[in-house]
Regions:
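Basic/polar N-terminal segments that are highly enriched at the extreme N-terminus
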Residues: 1, 104, 109-110, 116, ...
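N-terminal intrinsically disordered, low-complexity, charge/repeat-rich segments that act as generic
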Residues: 1-106
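Generic detector of short, locally flexible boundary/turn motifs and exposed helical patches
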Residues: 3, 42-44, 103-108, 131-134, ...
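Basic/aromatic-rich interaction segments and small domains that mediate binding to polyanionic partners
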Residues: 12-38, 80-81, 124-136, 143-225
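Solvent-exposed, non-transmembrane amphipathic alpha-helical segments
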Residues: 57, 61, 72, 97-101, ...
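Short, Lys/Arg-enriched charge-dense amphipathic segments
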Residues: 69-80, 92-93, 109-119, 175-181, ...
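Short, structured beta-strand/loop micro-motifs enriched in basic residues and often containing a Trp
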Residues: 102-104, 112-126, 146-150
Length: 225
């Protein structure tokens, strides 16, 4: 996660104003189109979920702070479409198609297949021979923040929980490892754990220090204290 993308416990962003389900799903008509474009493009099989997330993280900081939620989605989608050679900057400027992308057209999402495809989802659970390193109830400590293999790379370990102690509350089956999958290094599935952290261990002055924060963390993020 980039610093801008990883906002937990960060100062200077103002209060969070939850809507408690009162706001419409899409505040503007184009928001729904942005979601549809992103989902439909993902079915072209040119990138995976973790690559898509990393594309949004890589937006220029000035753009990321200025863009609305779905503007971030469109900007990240635009960047990855160009990076994968499916769209050119000239096509984006003119609105006129020039590239031959017939080789990926076979994967396009049709109207008839939308409901079934979305219901099927994209499960990230995998079967491996890996034996879980940690057990239920065991105390663990997270590693320092950052992707250990790719400088500035994608990771699902938030900075506010880095180098912190917690306890294992659930041991899940292996799941695709985002730190590898986002950068073309394969799925590299690892055991996934739900780890409980006391709020007082994550932040210096929490309102309720004994509250617990539950995070799903991969085995590579954890070590013995």
């Amino acid at each position: 996660m980039s610093r801008l993308h990883d906002m937990g416990g960060r100062f200077g962003d103002g209060p969070v104003a939850p809507d408690f389900g009162q706001e419409p799903v899409f505040k503007e008509e184009w928001h729904g189109r942005a979601l549809a474009l992103t989902v439909a493009s993902g079915f072209l099989r040119q990138w995976n979920l973790d690559e898509g997330r990393h594309a949004r993280e890589c937006l220029a900081p000035m753009d990321y702070t200025a863009f609305s939620y779905y503007e971030k989605w469109l900007a990240g989608l635009t960047d990855i479409l160009v990076a994968k050679g499916l769209v050119t900057p000239e096509e984006l400027s003119t609105g006129q198609a020039a590239l031959d992308v017939s080789d990926v057209a076979q994967h396009k999402l049709t109207q008839e297949s939308v409901a079934e495809s979305l219901a099927r989802g994209g499960p990230s659970e995998r079967q491996t021979d890996e034996t879980p390193k940690f057990a239920l109830g065991e105390q663990v400590k997270t590693i320092p923040a950052g992707n250990r293999s790719v400088a500035g790379g994608h990771t699902r370990l938030p900075s506010y929980a880095a180098s912190c102690s917690g306890r294992i509350v659930t041991v899940h089956p292996p799941h695709v490892f985002p730190d590898a999958n986002a950068h073309g290094y394969g799925e590299a599935a690892e055991t996934l754990y739900t780890v409980a952290f006391k709020a007082g261990d994550l932040w210096q002055h929490p309102e309720n220090p004994t509250d617990e924060v539950m995070l799903d963390l991969w085995q590579s993020y954890l070590e013995t204290p």
